[in-house]
């Protein structure tokens, strides 16, 4: 009779030898609605579940598609209703307190921390420093640790040191491919750091028109690397309202 393999010793051995090793499954336990039943179902096959904690979600689309409204409005409001603390990183300098409050977002310091930054390196350092302190405080009690959601609006406006240096020198030659690599590294590290904790990230990004006549769909800026690294990517676009027989614009399907 074949003996059953006992993985107890092996599990203890690799746990001691590999720092930060995760064993077992880390399925999401907390979900935040996007405020749109159709979008929730598209993302998770559940009308009430949208953004999962422990994952990285990207909403990409053209200007006016509603990315900021959903990410910085609906999702933050619904997260706060669930007792989740939100860290909002504004890279576009476009999120006004009055606009957020009009969307029923609680802007008090005990519910929301708003940070304004423009460098992708600064965003990475901010997330890294937060995770170091978070892990030190809650390493022994992951289930009882506070729930946190990062919102970045948007990835497309982030700059690299190369962008800044060239602007100051008056030489606009592009970032030489550094930004796609930096965004990929940012998303990949966030996915790895958040997996075992009740921490999530939702970010918006821009799209641009495709130059390929055989592939006319809009392309997401920042390269393909971070798209594959993200847990969920939603491509959005804006459509005109339909008109009824009397010429009135309607939003019904």
Identify the residue ranges that each predicted region occupies.
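The Walker A/P-loop phosphate-binding site
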Residues: 2-110, 123-132
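Amphipathic alpha-helical transducer elements in NTP-driven molecular machines
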Residues: 32-36, 53, 68-69, 116-128, ...
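Residue-level signature of catalytic and energy-coupling elements of molecular machines
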Residues: 39, 100, 153, 205, ...
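Active-site phosphate-binding and catalytic loops of NTP-dependent enzymes
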Residues: 48-49, 84, 136-141, 195, ...
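Glycine-rich, flexible loop segments associated with nucleotide phosphate handling
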Residues: 50-57, 142-150, 175-179, 221, ...
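Structural motif
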Residues: 55-57, 85-87, 148-150, 200-202, ...
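Conserved inter-motif catalytic segment of the P-loop NTP-binding fold
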Residues: 62, 74, 78, 82-185, ...
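Phosphate-binding/switch region of NTP-binding enzymes
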Residues: 176-253
């Amino acid at each position: 009779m074949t003996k059953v393999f006992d993985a107890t010793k092996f599990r203890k051995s690799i746990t001691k030898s590999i720092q930060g090793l995760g064993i077992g499954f880390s399925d999401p336990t907390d979900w935040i609605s996007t405020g749109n039943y159709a979008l929730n179902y598209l993302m998770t096959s559940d009308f009430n579940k949208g953004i999962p904690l422990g994952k990285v979600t990207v909403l990409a689309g053209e200007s006016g598609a509603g990315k900021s409204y959903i990410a910085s409005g609906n999702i933050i409001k619904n997260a706060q209703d669930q007792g989740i603390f939100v860290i909002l990183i504004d890279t576009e300098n476009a999120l006004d307190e009055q606009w957020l409050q009009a969307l029923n977002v609680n802007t008090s310091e005990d519910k929301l921390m708003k940070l304004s930054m423009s460098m992708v390196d600064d965003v990475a350092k901010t997330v890294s420093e937060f995770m170091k302190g978070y892990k030190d405080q809650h390493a022994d009690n992951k289930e009882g640790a506070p729930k946190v959601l990062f919102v970045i609006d948007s990835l497309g406006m982030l700059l690299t040191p190369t962008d800044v240096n060239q602007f100051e020198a008056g030489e606009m030659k592009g970032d030489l491919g550094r930004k796609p690599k930096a965004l990929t590294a940012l998303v990949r590290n966030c996915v790895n750091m958040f997996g075992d904790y009740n921490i999530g990230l939702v970010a918006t990004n821009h799209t641009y028109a495709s130059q390929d006549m055989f592939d006319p769909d809009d392309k997401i800026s920042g390269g393909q690397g971070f798209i594959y690294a993200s847990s969920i990517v939603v491509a959005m676009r804006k459509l005109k309202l339909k008109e009824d027989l009397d010429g009135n614009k309607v939003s019904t399907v």
